Amino acid sequence: MRARLALAVSGVDYELREVSLKSKPDELLAASPKGTVPVLVLPGGQVIDESLDIMHWALAQNDPDGWLKHPLDEMLALIAGNDGQFKQALDRYKYPNRYTLESDGDTQAFALAQRLKAENWLAKLEPRLSLGWLFGNQPSLADMATLPFVRQFAHTDAAWFAAQPWPQLRAWLTYFEASALFESVMAKHKSWQSMI
């Protein structure tokens, strides 16, 4: 989602191909053998297959909302924490059955322990959001790179999330989910079919 956010806000023309990861098209695997999404194939054939790299590329083309105007090293440090400790805990909290070797068979206790790790990360974000966004009063690369993962976390147990002492975090997420940008990237698309 975060790659789509940056592509959309940049206004760069691109062709979206929604693919089923259960039946990966040969074209996807030819472009990026690791077979994950997103993948951006540029007109010259260069392939960018990491979402954060796609965000950087799109915003380097056009950054009309100033997502890159804040100190890049500070934003990247925050994103690294999100993509590292928080994302690891999120995956294990949301899908504990995928980590049975790590859970010693008690997936429920394992999921709750992972939720606690994720909570610690989110608690650090709460005071940063006093002006509405992570780096002040306007969205930044850091906001748009982290919000999709915070959204996944919140929707894993929405009632529990709503009861947490994070009013600024919830307001941030609610504003994002109500935005036209979010709606535009969440539009459903048919799976692309190869012509071969």
Positions of predicted regions on the chain:
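GST-like domain detector, emphasizing the conserved glutathione-binding G-site
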Residues: 1-112, 119
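Residues that scaffold the ATP/ADP-binding catalytic core of kinase and kinase-like folds
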Residues: 57, 156, 185
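GST-like fold's C-terminal all-alpha helical module
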Residues: 74, 78-175
